[in-house]
Amino acid sequence: MMRKDPKCKCEKRAVTKANSVCRLYSRLQSAYLDILQKTDSIETIQCNVPLDGLSVGAYTSDFLCKCKDGSFLVRECVERKFLAKPMTVSLLDASRKFWKKRGISNWGIVTNQEKTDV
C-alpha cells in the first residue's frame, strides 16, 4: 500500500498481463510482480490501484488481479518490519474493508521473508 503520490525511487516495468507500465516502489513489489506474471491462473494485473474515497487519505493498493475464473484478488506488499506499526495496521484494514465493500474478498498481504542470523 502506497500513498497516491509517492516521492521515492520508482522502477517501471512492462509485463504482458498488465495493460500499462507497472510502477514499482520496492523490491518486494518487483518480486511479487514476477510471481503474478508467472501464475497461470492470473489473467490481468493492475498496479497501484487508487482507493478513491478512503477516509484515511489518498492511497493505492499494490495489485488488483483478475483471475481466469472471473474472480479478483488484491495483494498489499508490506515489509515485515512495518507489520506491527499501528498506522500500517490501520491502512491495511482500510484497504481490506474498501475491497470487501466492492465484492472482493480474496485480499491478502505479501511480506518479505525474515532472515535468521546463524
Sequence positions of predicted segments:
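Electrostatic, structured charged patches in enzyme active sites and in nucleic-acid/phosphate-binding
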Residues: 1-118
